[in-house]
Structure formats: C-alpha cells, structure tokens
Amino acid sequence: MAAPAATDQAWEAVIGLETHVQLGTNSKIFTAASTAFGDDPNTHIDPVVCGLPGTLPVLNQKVLEYAVKAAMALNLNIAEHSKFDRKQYFYPDLPKNYQISQYDEPIAEDGWIEVEVAEKGKDTYLKTIGIERLHMEEDAGKLVHAGSDRLAGSTHSLVDYNRAGVALAEIVSKPDLRTGREAAEYASEIRRIMRYLGVSDGNMQEGSLRCDVNISVRRGPEAPFGTKVEIKNMNSFSAIQKACEYEIQRQIKAYEAGEPIVQETRLWDESKQLTKSMRSKEGASDYRYFPDPDLGPIEVSADQRDSWRAELPELPAAKRHRYADTLGLSQYDARVLTDEKPMADYFEAVVVAGADAKLAANWITGDIAAYVNSNRLSYANLPFRPEQLAEMVQLIDGGKISGKIAKEILPELLENGGSPKAIVDERGLGMISDPAAIEAIVDELLGAHPDEVEAFRGGKTKLQGFFVGQLMKKTGGKADPKLANQILSKKLKG
C-alpha cells in the first residue's frame, strides 16, 4: 500500500488483539484426553486428537460453560444458536489438516471491557475497549525445532500433540487500542478476568494465554486504516508493549521514506527487541471454512444463561470501583489489591474481621505481599490468617502498639500465625500511653542533653526529631508518638 498522503495530522496507531485463552478443563474440547501440562511428549493423545478415520468429536460441556461465562464477563451477547466450522490449513502441528473453530456464527459477539491505563509520565485513565467476538476452537500441537527457534534454519523438527485439542476461547478486540501500553493493559485485564472466573490460569509461560497483535498506522483519527500487520511470539505483557512500540515506529519510518507496508505476519524477537518478517498474511478465503458435519449446532438456553450468570464472581473492574468509592482506597491500592483474586479475598476477609480498610491495604500491599511473593506462597495457605491481621491492625489503630512494634512481630506472625495481642501482652510490647510516665522520661532526656535544648530554643527546631528518636530508643519504640511529641514540644519550649 502506498504511503498515506502527508497532512498536518500526527501519526496514530490502530491496534487490535486476538487473545487465545486455554480453558482450564481437565479433558480436551472434543475428547476425554488429558490436558495436563508438562508431561512427556505425545502421552495425552487418542484417535480423535490424531484425526484417525472413523472417529467423531463430542463437545465437552464444561468448555461451553467456561466459554459462555468468559463471554458474559466481557459483556458479550451470547448467541442462542452457534456452530463449529473447519478451518483448513496444512501444518505439521495439525494432525487432521484442519482446525475445528467457529467462523461466521461464534458463541458470542459485541462486548466491551473497561481498562485502567497507567502511561509513564501521564495520569492514569480509564478506557473502554470494544470486543468483536469470542469463539471456541481447539488448540494445535507444538513444534520443537532443532538447531533454531524457527522452522527456517532448523536441522529437523519434532512435534508434540499433547496440546492438540486443548480447548481455546479466542477473544478478538475491536481496533480501539492506540498505544503499546493500552494493548498490554488490555491483555492483562483479560487475563485478570479469566483468573477471577476460574476458567483459565492465564499462564503465559506455559502458553495458557497467547496474544497476536494486529497493528497499522494512519494520519490522524479520521483517516482510513493503514495496511495491517500481525505480530506473534510475545510471551509477556511487557513484550506486547515493546513489540507494539517498535512496530509503530517501523511503519511510520517506512511510510515517511515512501516505502510500502506489506500485509504480513511478523515475529517479535525478544533478544533483538525488534519484529521480523515471518510470512505473508492469509485471509479468511485461504482457510476455506465450512461447517463441521460431525458436530451439531450449539444451543444455549435462557435457563442455562441465567444459571451461569448467577455463578459469576465480582469482577476486577467492579472491585476496583468499590474499593475506591466505598472503602476510600487510592486508585493505586485498589489496583494492586485486585490484581489477583486471592489477594483481594484476603483483604476483604481482613476488613470483614473489623480492620480499617486503608491500614489493612497498607500492610497487605507492602510487607505481606513482599513475604508472599518472595516465598512463593498463596494467600489461602498463609499462616497469618485474615482475622489475625485484623487484630494487629486494630491494635495499631487503637493506639495499643506502634507501627514499629508491629513490624518487629510481623515476621514471626507471617511464619507461624498466632494472636498479635497475645504476643504483645506476653512480651510487654504495649504502647506507653501514660502521660506521667512519658513526661518523666522526657525530663530525664532534657536533663541529659542541655546543649541540644539550648540550641532548640535558639531556633534549631528540627532538633525535636532528635529528642523523639532518643525517646523511642529509651522506650524500645513503645512510647505513644503523638503524646510523646506533644509533651516534648511543650517541655522544649519551656
């Protein structure tokens, strides 16, 4: 395609994502073969997976349930009737030489999600991204190339059909994304939603979630779309962002140099941080779709839809809004707490047990999250139970212990659990909040540091911090800091 006509308009990227989500069923989409990951090659295959003559596929009903729930969470319209089609292409990882997918009658269409975008150097903003469709299909096998990471240049290739026939939900966004960051945040939100639903683990390293990016550039928002390029081989959200950013600049430079953009599929090379040409891009006509004669129409009744909708959990975006609007949390804390459902569940249990939401959020997103992540633990199995953290937060909030004391006992609580109050009482760690006791210690300190007292009264008021530090040292951090500051201020001023 020729370069767009030069105008005063800045270049704008137009990005859409095709997200392939492996549905977390125990058996494959059309057969009882296992979906277990990481086992020896070609151990989870059977005549249906291999496409042997005389075999017939049977739709796994759990796949249909998961696909419909995913579609509902993405605000898609569920089709009462849909069908499966055969997508014809010849490649070693496809044992039947066709893939069972959905072409013109998918299970769901026309939805949207809200994405929170944190662009570097800019304010966080919300953006609604349209979703074209969600359809079910089977995954292909996996090729391992010897001597190269690609077919070209390899000495030979091995094929593992364990993945062939695993259920996929393909989610196709509308071309509403404009930056690499938006694309990465959109993909991240899709994974977050799938994990909340429990329909997929979304593990990108294991291929449970894979994204293909379609990207073009144009002169301004009113200009027609440019030539679309597909990018594959991105195994992280940061790779999605970097691949988009690189490709946007590559296309702009090509147009400005008068070079055409070719409709093609390109691979993201993580080591070189660039995209490189893989093959020309096929169109729908190249696949010669036709209805699969071995599979009947798919029907989803109103009762089924109502039943499955009732089982949906509160989703991440709704949680973020509730945490900010009802609990008064910052956007940042709401985002961090809702990133993983187990963390959100833990936080909510702490609040239900009586803790102040903001204080609980500070502890969970800080010290507790660091401990869980560094030790690769789950919140469900953390020895420090939500009600115990709530007890500790209440001790701090009620002035019974200081934050310093809480930090001192926290490692033991994280490792073994137990009652924070019992530990505080047993070790005499409670806050000193008796004014007379604190006043006596202050008098002692002022008497021991006459030069500093004179300097303070001479205008060096920052020395109050020195006395606070000495007081905390003397009391082992147990003095009520607010009361201590009040008494110190009064005494220092004479």
UniProtKB/Swiss-Prot annotation:
Gene3D superfamilies: 1.10.10.410, GatB domain, N-terminal subdomain. It catalyses: L-glutamyl-tRNA(Gln) + L-glutamine + ATP + H2O = L-glutaminyl-tRNA(Gln) + L-glutamate + ADP + phosphate + H(+); L-aspartyl-tRNA(Asn) + L-glutamine + ATP + H2O = L-asparaginyl-tRNA(Asn) + L-glutamate + ADP + phosphate + 2 H(+). InterPro entries: Asn/Gln-tRNA_amidoTrfase_suB/E, Asn/Gln-tRNA_Trfase_suB/E_cat, Asn/Gln_amidotransferase, Asn/Gln_tRNA_amidoTrase-B-like, GatB, GatB_C_1, GatB_Yqey_C_2, Gln-tRNA_amidoTrfase_suB_CS. One of its GO terms (molecular function) is glutaminyl-tRNA synthase (glutamine-hydrolyzing) activity. Its EC number is 6.3.5.-. Pfam families: GatB_N, GatB_Yqey. Keywords: ATP-binding, Ligase, Nucleotide-binding, Protein biosynthesis. One of its GO terms (biological process) is glutaminyl-tRNAGln biosynthesis via transamidation. Belongs to the GatB/GatE family. GatB subfamily. Heterotrimer of A, B and C subunits. Allows the formation of correctly charged Asn-tRNA(Asn) or Gln-tRNA(Gln) through the transamidation of misacylated Asp-tRNA(Asn) or Glu-tRNA(Gln) in organisms which lack either or both of asparaginyl-tRNA or glutaminyl-tRNA synthetases. The reaction takes place in the presence of glutamine and ATP through an activated phospho-Asp-tRNA(Asn) or phospho-Glu-tRNA(Gln). HAMAP family: GatB. This is Aspartyl/glutamyl-tRNA(Asn/Gln) amidotransferase subunit B. It comes from Synechococcus sp. (strain WH7803).
